[in-house]
């Protein structure tokens, strides 16, 4: 089984109760293997940076024009033509937003961290959720991957509300 290389950067002031490098690696690995439909996907490197609200706010404002911090930002790395590099991109995850959302949604913190690592990895692989059909496909993949890891459907609360 191929193991992705994860460069885990902790830029958050409070680093208590954060997932371990092994956890992030497992979550990203499962997303990559699911996408490749094989356990032996190409060598891949991803940077995961855990930040506080101030950095998330600045990045979200600069790159998305959104005047607030967000849970996860994905920055795919575009390798210049003719160069072979295993870099997939960077994920920026805001600790405070993750904790707040997990509490509001009444889900485990570990489950929400896993979901956002998987969600961000799928963005790095080219998935998006701007159009309804894209969102449905991406949410379906996230649900399959999360359930394969023993977590519940991350969108279950939204589905209950819709019914």
Swiss-Prot record:
GO BP term, pick one? rRNA processing
> Which cofactors is this protein said to need?
Zn(2+)
Q: Which InterPro entries match?
A: MetalPrtase_cat_dom_sf_prd, YbeY, YbeY_CS
Q: What is the uppermost EC class here?
A: hydrolase
Q: Give the principal location in a single coarse category.
A: cytoplasm
Q: Which Gene3D superfamilies match?
A: Metalloproteases ('zincins'), catalytic domain (3.40.390.30)
* Cited SUPFAM superfamilies: Metalloproteases ('zincins'), catalytic domain
The cofactor binding remark recorded in the entry reads: Binds 1 zinc ion.
* Molecular function as annotated in GO: metalloendopeptidase activity; RNA endonuclease activity; zinc ion binding
The task this protein performs is described as:
Single strand-specific metallo-endoribonuclease involved in late-stage 70S ribosome quality control and in maturation of the 3' terminus of the 16S rRNA.
Q: Which family does it belong to?
A: Belongs to the endoribonuclease YbeY family.
* NCBIfam families tied to this protein: rRNA maturation RNase YbeY (TIGR00043)
Q: What name does this protein carry? A: Endoribonuclease YbeY
What is the scientific name of the source organism? Actinobacillus pleuropneumoniae serotype 5b (strain L20)
Q: What is the lineage of its organism?
A: Bacteria, Pseudomonadati, Pseudomonadota, Gammaproteobacteria, Pasteurellales
């Amino acid at each position: 089984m191929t193991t992705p290389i994860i460069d885990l950067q902790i830029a958050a002031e409070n680093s208590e109760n954060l997932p371990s490098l092994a956890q992030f690696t497992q979550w990203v690995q499962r997303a990559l293997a699911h996408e490749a439909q094989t356990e032996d996907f190409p060598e891949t490197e991803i940077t995961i940076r855990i930040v506080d609200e101030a950095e998330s706010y600045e990045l979200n404002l600069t790159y998305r024009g959104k005047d607030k911090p967000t849970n996860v930002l994905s920055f795919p790395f575009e390798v210049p033509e003719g160069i072979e590099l295993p870099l997939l991109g960077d994920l920026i995850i805001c600790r405070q937003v993750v904790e707040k959302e997990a509490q509001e949604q009444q889900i485990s913190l570990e489950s929400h961290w896993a979901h956002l690592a998987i969600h961000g990895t799928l963005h790095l692989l080219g998935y998006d959720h701007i159009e309804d059909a894209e969102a449905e496909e991406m949410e379906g993949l996230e649900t399959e991957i999360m359930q394969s890891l023993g977590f519940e459907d991350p969108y279950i609360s939204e589905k209950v509300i819709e019914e």
